Amino acid sequence: AWDPLPTGDGQKLSLRVQSNGRAYRSYSFSFTEPWLGGKKRNSLTFGINSSKYSNAFDPFTGQIDRDRSDTNYLKTTGFSVSLGKQLKWPDDFFSLVYTLNVTNYKLLNYPIFDQNFRTGTSNNVSFKIGLQRSSVFNPIFPTSGSNIMASVQLTPPYSLFNKNISSSDNKYKNPEYHKWRFNAEWFVPIGKAMGADKSRQLVLKMAAKYGFMGRYNKKLDYSPFERFQVGDAGLTNNFGLLGYDIVAHRGYPVYQSSDPTV
């Protein structure tokens, strides 16, 4: 029988377009091959993306200003390549992922971190290694198992080769940092599963998260990109454009906490 839709071997193709007019637009494309090389579970993912966030709102008129959208904006263009490998040791639940990411930021009258960095370009080039062990049953609605992940993300130490980078006009042209993350989640079923298919299960989730961001040169400030954001639910802000990792803190505004030392 003729089948016009090939099933393939689990490849994933994604195309996403978002826009709300002059203020924001985003395009992204990615492709994942989960069986690179044929028999082994080695995944290869390639992705490209482009976005523009304009400060087009005029507070005096309460309207979107076309001219402001062309003179106050943040543009990002990037691509990434990721290679994942399932490990056999210590057990089959372990996987190792390597990711190369390149993102170009272009700012025009758009302060994001430093008031002196309102206009210019920045090239964020980083390499990330992530080790994960996941034994979660039913990933969409987990009922048991655990998910533990540790990763480190590094940029080249540009200041090691250019001693004058700290005194240059654009200190963030090539941002440098090293970023560490550790996440752990446990899902513990409570009581007996109910329902005809035993899918109704009360589950206790326990989690711990740790993040650290460092710099190679103390004369340079921390990178305005790839930071950690503490507070808020992480759903309604534009920090995703800057590569921020969101540490949700429900009930508190962005960057605020009951303990000012957090």
Locations of regions flagged by a protein language model:
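C-terminal outer-membrane beta-barrel translocator/porin domains of Gram-negative envelope proteins
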Residues: 1, 113-262
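Gram-negative/organellar outer-membrane beta-barrel architecture
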Residues: 1-141, 146-148, 247, 255-260
